[in-house]
Amino acid sequence: MNKGELVHAVTDKAKEQLGESITKKEVDAVISAAIDCIMEVVAEGEKVTLVGFGSFEARERKEREGRNPKTGDKMLIPATKVPAFSAGKMFKDKVAPEKK
C-alpha cells in the first residue's frame, strides 16, 4: 500500500466513523502532518508512542567492521543513529493472532 492508497482507505474509514464527509485532500494533509511531526520529534531524540500501535524512536547503531563492496578491503563503519519502530501489542495481535 502506498500513500495514495492509504489516504483513500483512511478517507473511507473516517467517513464511516464520523458519519460526515471528509475529503481526500484533508486526509492527505493530516497524514502528512502526522508523519512530519513524528520525524521531527524522533530526529530530536524523543520517542513517539501511539498506544496499541507502536512506538518510533532513534536508536544508536554501534561502530562496526565492514567491507568495501568494490575492493573487499576491511573498513570501520562509524556509529550512527537510525530510526526504529517497535510494534505495540494490539498491532502484533492483529498481524499474528494468538491461537488458543
UniProtKB/Swiss-Prot annotation:
Q: Its Gene Ontology biological processes?
A: chromosome condensation
* Xref: PROSITE patterns: HISTONE_LIKE
What InterPro entries does the database record attribute to this sequence? Hist_DNA-bd, Histone-like_DNA-bd_CS, IHF-like_DNA-bd_dom_sf
Looking at the record's lineage, which domain of life comes first? Bacteria
Q: Where is the signal peptide, in residue numbers?
A: none
Q: Which CDD domains match?
A: HU
Asked if the record carries the keyword DNA-binding, the reply is yes
Please tell me whether the keyword Nucleotide-binding is annotated for this protein. Answer: no
Gene Ontology MF terms: DNA binding; structural constituent of chromatin
An annotated GO cellular component of this protein is: cytosol
* A Pfam family the protein falls into: Bac_DNA_binding
Name the keywords, alphabetized.
DNA condensation, DNA-binding
Per its database record, what is this protein's job?
Histone-like DNA-binding protein which is capable of wrapping DNA to stabilize it, and thus to prevent its denaturation under extreme environmental conditions.
Similarity comment text for this entry? Belongs to the bacterial histone-like protein family.
Q: What is this protein called?
A: DNA-binding protein HU
Name of encoding gene? hup
